[in-house]
Amino acid sequence: MAAVDAILAGKYPAKAHARRVAESLQSHRNGCPGIVYLEAQKTRLIEDNDEPVPFRQRRPFFYLSGCPLSDSCLVYDLSEDQLTLFIPPVDPEDVIWSGLPMSTEQAQNQYDVDRVLVTTELNSTLASIASSHGGKAIAFTIADQVSESTQFHGFSEVNQSVLKGVIEQSRVVKDEYEVALLRKANDISAKAHIAAIKASQTAVNEREIEGAFIATCIANGAREQSYHPIVACGENGAILHYGKNDDTLIDPVTNQKKRNVLIDAGGEYRTYCADITRVIPVGGKFTAETRQIYDIVLQMQTECIAMLKEGVQWEDVHAHAHRVAIRGLLRLGILRGAEDEIFEKRVSVAFFPHGLGHYLGMDTHDTGGNPNYTDKDTMFRYLRVRGRLPAGSVITVEPGVYFCRFIIEPYIKSPESNKYIDTNVLDRYWRVGGVRIEDNVVVTKNGYDNLTTAPKAVDEIERLAVS
C-alpha cells in the first residue's frame, strides 16, 4: 500500500472537483457569472439529550472541499475559479470542553482551496462577489441545505434545482486520489474480513463476528462503517439486508453449528466506502450443499467481472449473471427445463432477486446510477445502475443465490413457474440460506481493476476458518 499512501499524503483534489462541476453548470448559466454555495452538515443534538448525533459529513460539500468539519460552508466563484472555505470561528466556551479547533491557517495548509475564512465573514463575502459581477451572478445551491442566515443579496437568481444532480453525476467517474481512498478502504476491510473469519471458530453468536470486524476496522484507521454490517448465519443469509446480528450460531433443531455465515461489511476510510461480502463455513469446512451454491456464485462473479470495461452495458452483465445461475441450478436439479425458457420466464429471479451491483464511492449506493425501480421486468427492477459503464467508475459485483421461502414459494405455487422448480431437490438447500460474493471493481478503458483482496477461494477461506 506504499503507492496508495503516497497518493493520500497529498491534498484531496477539491479544486479539480469544483472545476468538473463548473464545466457541467455552463449550460445552466447562459453566459452569466455564478457561484456554487454548499454547506457542511450541522452539529445536531440527540433529542432530549445534550450528546451530539453521530456526525456524517454532507457528501456534496466534501466533494468540493475535502473538509470533514461540521458547521462549515464553501463558495466557489465559477468565473474567477476561486474556491473559498469558511470554517467556524473559535468559541471560547467550546474550547473548555473540546480544545482549540482548526485555525484558518491550518485549514489553508490541509485543504485544496484558495482561501479560508471564518463563517462570520460569509455574508459580506457573498455581497462582495455579487457586487463584483454587477448583480448578474447566479447562486447555485441545494434545496433544504441552506441556512436561513445565509444572504444572497445582489444575485440575479438563486437556483436550487440543478446543482445536486450535477454533483451526483460528476461523482460517478473517480480520479486517482478517490481510487486510492477506495483501495485503502478495501485493504482495511479485507483485514477485517479475515479477522471475522477467524472469529467464527469460537463465536457462538453473530455479534461476536461483527465485533471482530468493527474492531479491526477501527484499529486500522477506518473508524466508521460504510453501512450497518450484515452478519447472517444459516437461513438468515437469505435476508438481503439482515440487520439483527444477534442470532446464535447453534441450530436449535440439530443442536449443531449452523452451516455458514454471510458477512456483508465494509469500513469507511476518510469518507470513502468499501462494500465486501463473503460467506464462511462455521465448522471450518463448507457442507456439500453450501459448496455447490458457492461454486455457482463464484462462477457468476468471475464471468461478470471478466466482462467489465469502458462502455459495457450493465444490463448485459446482470443478465449474464442470471444465465450462469440458471445453468448451475439446472446442473444441481433445483431447476428443470430449458435454459432459455427459464430465463425468459424470469424464474431465476426467485433465487437471485436483486441487482448485480451499484456504484461505490462516498456512499455505499453511490450516485449517478439512474435506477428504474418501476421497471415491470422483475429481472431489472432492482438494478441500481442502468446503462453503459464509463472508465473510472467503481462498481460492486455481487451476485448471489438465495433460498428465501417468502420469495420462492410464490413461484412454486404459480402455474407459470412451478414446473421449472423441483421442490424435492430444493428441500435440501433451504438451510444454506444465501450465498453472495461481492468485490469492488474499477472500470478501465480496456478492462478492470479489482480493489478487493479479501479471500474468496474455498481452500483459503476454509484454511483461515480453522487457523
UniProtKB/Swiss-Prot annotation:
Keywords: Aminopeptidase, Hydrolase, Manganese, Metal-binding, Metalloprotease, Protease. It is an enzyme of class 3 (hydrolase). Its cofactor is Mn(2+). It comes from the Eukaryota. GO terms for biological process: proteolysis. Mn(2+) 1 binds at residues 275, 398, 438. Its EC number is 3.4.11.9. Binds 2 manganese ions per subunit. GO terms for molecular function: manganese ion binding; metalloaminopeptidase activity. It catalyses: Release of any N-terminal amino acid, including proline, that is linked to proline, even from a dipeptide or tripeptide. Catalyzes the removal of a penultimate prolyl residue from the N-termini of peptides. This is Probable Xaa-Pro aminopeptidase pepP.
